[in-house]
């Protein structure tokens, strides 16, 4: 069974169980809510001139909060998110740069050690060649 049919059956069953669908279908002449201001609101408007009536006070508008609450696009949110991402990447780049610097220092140390090792090997090879040369010249 498809999902749309399943959802349609659920909506119809819910409306039928709640009596919403049948009430409008069975009694089309049933009184509906009228789009007129309620009597309480009209009465309160009339009594504002009297001393005992409820009077509403005007509140000073705060321009900062008005700017914060006005509808706007996602620009401010995106600016905050991009600032956060830039800050995150700058921290990550700093960590990567430190790691690369440490790696380069380690490589320089290893290269220096390898150079010393190669020089030592060359010295040992020359010493062995000299010994072999002297042995050959002694035997001749």
From Swiss-Prot:
A motif (RxLR-dEER) lies at residues 54-72. Effector that suppresses plant defense responses during the early stages of pathogen infection. Suppresses cell death induced by effectors and PAMPs in plant hosts. Acts as a modulator of histone acetyltransferase (HAT) in plants. Avh23 binds to the ADA2 subunit of the HAT complex SAGA and disrupts its assembly by interfering with the association of ADA2 with the catalytic subunit GCN5. As such, Avh23 suppresses H3K9 acetylation mediated by the ADA2/GCN5 module and increases plant susceptibility. ADA2-binding IR repeats lie at residues 100-113, 114-127. Interacts with host histone acetyl transferase SAGA complex subunit ADA2. This is RxLR effector protein Avh23. Induction: Expression is strongly up-regulated during the early stages of infection. The lineage of its organism: Eukaryota, Sar, Stramenopiles, Oomycota, Peronosporales. Transmembrane segments: none annotated. The gene is Avh23.
